[in-house]
Amino acid sequence: MKVENFLAQKSINYDKIDRFLMFRMYEKYKKCFKNIPIIQLIGTNGKGSTGRYLTQLLENLNYKIGHYTSPHIFSFNERFYLDGKIANDEELDQAHIRLEEIFKQDLQKLSYFEYATFLAMILFQKCDFIVLEAGVGGEYDATSVFERRMNIFTRIGFDHVQILGNSLEDIARTKLKIMAPIALISDEQE
């Protein structure tokens, strides 16, 4: 699998990430991505279940949905839910080949999560809606580079303090800075 070979070279840690690389890469290549309505999920807890519930709701309304989540438990493929099922190896490899065509040498610059995020956007090009779960959440998250139709904020608590801030207020402020014109915010907060 081409994707596995590529990922074997990547660290899954956030320690050496250039917070602005994803924004620069998207600006450089955004013409290669379709403008599909995106619903972004942000929060400390509850993104996965909220995302899957929302995905199934939209699928029941006969929309074609791509759902990008992290982390995975058993297999990288679990991060990509398309047409009611987890993406298979062939689908991921085809998306990887397309990313190589677009990014060429720039592909190597991306972090594990940035790469996976762009891979999702290629994989979901024929969807009616895309549900993206933020990784680190907030203004510097790889999923925040794309224009979002809506944000859903689940419970916000203490996470990624080295990036988001040391207080709950700082963390919430960082996450809320990327709020789309339409947003739902969970009333159950820490």
Label the model's feature ranges.
Residues 26-35, 60-146, 158, 162-164, ...:
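ATP-dependent carboxylate-amine ligase catalytic core
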Residues 129, 133, 149-190:
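Acidic, Mg2+-coordinating active-site environments of NTP-dependent enzymes
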Residues 45-47, 72-73:
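Short active-site-proximal "capping" loops at secondary-structure junctions
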